[in-house]
């Protein structure tokens, strides 16, 4: 939620739009409670169910629904707010907390038998990092160099594995 607010402010987004972005950020991973993959639709449905009780309008809920669904990978945002939530969702790829979050994700995937080895994990990371792109000018400027450094770091590590 902090990343979405930071990016929104730096992108000159104000008022209700920041409120909607922060709400979408809170709900966008809520579907993980029910299932691991393709959880965005569940989070969006949960938001649709709960938010009317807190005075959200149908129009606001529809925007939140679209924002949540925009975070599905591969991401294809259709407007500025969707670009912001997509960049915030994967902000860590170029952030200082990359190793901490990547390690947690690696453990999740290993527990689900989606990767079995460090080499498989690094190959998956390289593929994801190279296919990913930031959309907002702010995220590109803030995260591009760190993300590039992570790619080079992982590529170097991949060269050390023995097959």
Residue ranges and their predicted role:
Residues 2-15, 27, 56, 73-163:
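Divalent metal-dependent phosphate-bond-processing catalytic cores, especially two-metal-ion Mg2+/Mn2+ enzymes
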Residues 16-34, 43, 64-72:
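His-Asp-centered metal-binding catalytic motifs of divalent-metal-dependent phosphohydrolases/nucleases
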